[in-house]
From Swiss-Prot:
It comes from Pediococcus pentosaceus (strain ATCC 25745 / CCUG 21536 / LMG 10740 / 183-1w). This is Foldase protein PrsA. Residues 1-19 form the signal peptide. Residues 136-229 form the PpiC domain. It is a lipid-anchor. It comes from the Bacteria. Keywords: Cell membrane, Isomerase, Lipoprotein, Membrane, Palmitate, Rotamase, Signal. One of its GO terms (cellular component) is plasma membrane.
Length: 295
């Protein structure tokens, strides 16, 4: 969820900018502050200009790709985050100054941007072959998280003595989002950026049905991992969809690619800046000559 949180981080402020008028924002013994005054002050700040950029990009993305992102898709991704973080989900939202509604708004914004990337990224067979070299199918594992190494070692001893992994996960794991599922987590591959790198490295070494024989130290504590499903790689033609997804996901993390895509989207969006003080707000994407021609 971290990428989503940083993606369109100023979305909440956007509503403030959109609601300008002569209404009073605050009153003091020295006088009142109106929305117009607030806007005039805010628009000249870096954060204010960033908000306007994001609002414009969101508007044109919604117009061009809105029909490709359903409410169901947004809800599905939202629920995956909720399941992933379990009981800590609300506190994570709160610490990032977000609500359920604002998170869903950001998820939609990111999905719209991904649709733009997909539409503008022509993937060749050579691209697929290159991606295939490092491709490994998603694996499914179960894990037991504890705070002490000695506890993890005791769990491994119980497994060696024939203990049931699912029962041990429910008994010992401190991960509230997975313990009642026997420690099972969503399938992942090497491109997953939310899992600890030590966790992934240890997991990929396991054969199906095997578990780690020593505790795995991660940023969360100590983990015992069991491989549940490890599909064979198979043929490239069987994984075209997954390969394209990997390429698109990589592009979503590449600033040069995103800048190029957003530039194309904005040019197609017929954007006109009406406020002369903000005429250069899109220079990052359209260049000074394009922005200065707006009225």
């Amino acid at each position: 969820m971290k990428k989503v949180l940083i993606g369109f981080a100023s979305i909440a402020m956007a509503f403030t900018l959109a609601a300008c008028g002569n209404k009073t924002v605050a009153t003091t013994s020295g006088g009142k502050i109106t929305q117009d005054e607030y806007y005039s002050s805010l628009k000249n700040t870096t954060s204010g200009k960033q908000v306007l950029q994001e609002m414009i990009v969101n508007k044109v993305l919604e117009k061009q790709y809105g029909d490709k992102v359903s409410k169901k898709t947004v809800t599905k991704q939202y629920n995956s985050y909720k399941d992933q973080y379990g009981s800590s989900f609300k506190s994570i939202l709160s610490s990032n100054g977000m609500t359920t509604s604002s998170l869903k708004t950001q998820i939609r914004s990111n999905l719209l941007l991904k649709e733009a990337v997909k539409a503008n990224d022509k993937i060749s067979n050579a691209d697929l072959k290159k991606e295939w070299k490092s491709y490994e199918p998603k694996v499914t594992v179960a894990q037991i998280l504890v705070s002490k190494k000695s506890t993890a070692e005791d769990i491994i001893k119980k497994l060696n003595d024939g203990g049931d992994f699912t029962k041990l996960a429910k008994q010992y794991s401190t991960d509230s989002s997975t313990k009642n599922k026997g420690g099972k987590i969503a399938a992942f591959d090497d491109t997953n950026s939310t899992l600890d790198s030590s966790f992934k490295k240890a997991a990929f070494k396991l054969d199906e049905g095997k578990y780690t024989t020593t505790p795995v130290k991660t940023e969360y504590g100590y983990q015992v991992i069991k491989m549940i499903n490890k599909p064979s790689k198979g043929k490239m033609s069987d994984h075209t969809k997954e390969l394209k997804e990997r390429i698109w996901n990589a592009d979503m993390s590449d600033s040069t690619t995103l800048r190029s895509v957003i530039t194309k989207v904005l040019k197609k969006g017929n954007v006109t800046i009406k406020d002369k003080d903000l005429k250069n707000v899109l220079d990052d994407y359209l260049g000074s000559s394009a922005s200065s021609s707006t009225k």
